[in-house]
From Swiss-Prot:
It is found in: Cytoplasm. PANTHER family: POLYNUCLEOTIDYL TRANSFERASE, RIBONUCLEASE H-LIKE SUPERFAMILY PROTEIN (PTHR33317:SF4). Could be a nuclease involved in processing of the 5'-end of pre-16S rRNA. The lineage of its organism: Bacteria, Bacillati, Bacillota, Clostridia, Thermoanaerobacterales. Its EC number is 3.1.-.-. This is Putative pre-16S rRNA nuclease.
């Protein structure tokens, strides 16, 4: 089962995929946000092109576990995606994911401009890997 991971931000959407067996996640691309319609069109194109069977979208939460304004924006976007696609869309806690990737890229001495180009798709990969690891350990289906 091929899965898609999404890291949805105000300016960019990071996209990651798994292999056909749903075992290994890899970064695919970063979508520069233009309009909800174009963003949704591109995501559904990727779903169709790669035969994605489930979308795992990062849901930003506060450190206390509450859904804040950014989380509400993500949920609204995902509602629109669910209308356009028959593929199941689930959310996954993404607390500190982008910060974790940023820290890793800084330690790898990657410049700010290059980090900006990859951070979102790497965050999507981290979200997807977290989901895959939880499935392997039996914490999620």
């Amino acid at each position: 089962m091929r899965l898609m991971g999404l890291d949805i931000g105000d300016r960019r959407i990071g996209v990651a995929l798994t292999d056909e067996n749903g075992v290994a996640a890899y970064p695919l691309e970063v979508l520069e946000r233009t309009s909800p319609e174009k963003d949704l069109r591109r995501i559904t194109e990727i779903i169709d092109q790669y035969g994605v069977e489930r979308v795992v979208a990062g849901l930003p939460k506060t450190l206390s576990g509450q859904i804040g304004p950014q989380g509400d924006k993500v949920l609204s976007f995902l509602d629109k995606l669910r209308v356009r696609s028959t593929v199941p869309v689930i959310t996954w806690d993404e607390r500190l994911t982008t910060a974790e990737v940023e820290k890793l890229l800084v330690s790898a001495d990657l410049g700010r401009r290059r980090r900006r180009k990859v951070v979102d798709k790497l965050a999507a990969t981290l979200i997807l890997n977290s989901y895959l690891n939880s499935r392997k350990s039996g914490r999620n289906t």
